[in-house]
Regions:
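Conserved, well-folded catalytic cores of nucleic-acid-processing
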Residues: 17-20, 32-36, 88, 117, ...
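Phosphate-handling DNA/RNA-contact segment within nucleic-acid enzymes
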Residues: 48-63, 104-198
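Short, small-residue-biased leader/transition segments that mark boundaries at the very start
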Residues: 2-7
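Conserved active-site segments centered on acidic
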Residues: 24-77
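OB-fold/S1-family RNA-binding modules
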Residues: 81
């Protein structure tokens, strides 16, 4: 194998684990190693895709903070979520480090809070935070669940996992974000970002 193969593997590794396009991966590496690159103008389609990805990451970042706030500040979050984590031996520092949270057991609490905060419904749908129905109704995907954010290698929240707490629920015990422009389940390993910080 030549030196070019080594560079290709590095770029593809960054593409896969950072959820970046080829060009964004090159920019990432250039910035990391202080290499100046000359860029061409992006097409309108490329600009739109980049903008959508950035918007989805921004929405997920907001949602992670929202879920953590509900866990610590809402009575339901403290009574159900914090109790669940305590019963399973999660220490306070672990809960905070992994940015765990809680989604209220209400049909559209996250959706209403997100819209009120100025986030667009389309990105709440694209990230899988909400499920929209043809009749116009919207449900929070993770309601009534403890939340486990999934981080990319760079620390960006790309998805969520949620575990239902009610024992009598006739629903899936675990729910994950669907695959999206920013999340491909086969490319992510839960906790890898924090493992790399060690």
């Amino acid at each position: 194998r030549g030196l070019g193969d080594v560079y290709k593997r590095q770029v593809h590794f960054i593409m896969k684990h950072e959820q970046l396009s080829y060009y964004d991966a090159l920019r990432y590496l250039a910035k990391k190693y202080n290499i100046e690159i000359q860029e061409r103008e992006l097409s309108e389609r490329e600009k739109q895709v980049r903008s959508d990805r950035e918007s989805m990451l921004i929405v997920n970042n907001w949602a992670q903070k929202y879920f953590t706030t509900q866990l610590y500040e809402h009575q339901e979050g403290k009574a159900a979520g914090l109790r669940y984590f305590a019963e399973r031996g999660f220490r306070e520092d672990t809960i905070r480090k992994f940015q765990l949270g809680y989604s209220l057991d209400q049909r559209d609490a996250l959706y209403k809070a997100a819209i009120k905060s100025g986030y667009k419904k389309v990105f709440l749908e694209k990230t899988g935070l909400v499920i929209a129905y043809d009749n116009g109704g919207v449900n929070d995907r993770f309601r009534g669940r403890v939340i486990f954010p999934v981080h990319s290698l760079s620390g960006k929240v790309v998805a969520f996992g949620g575990r239902v707490l009610k024992k009598d629920e006739k629903t899936a015990k675990y729910v994950n974000s669907p695959e999206s422009e920013i999340y491909h389940k086969s490319n992510e390993l839960y906790g890898i970002y924090f493992a790399c910080l060690l």
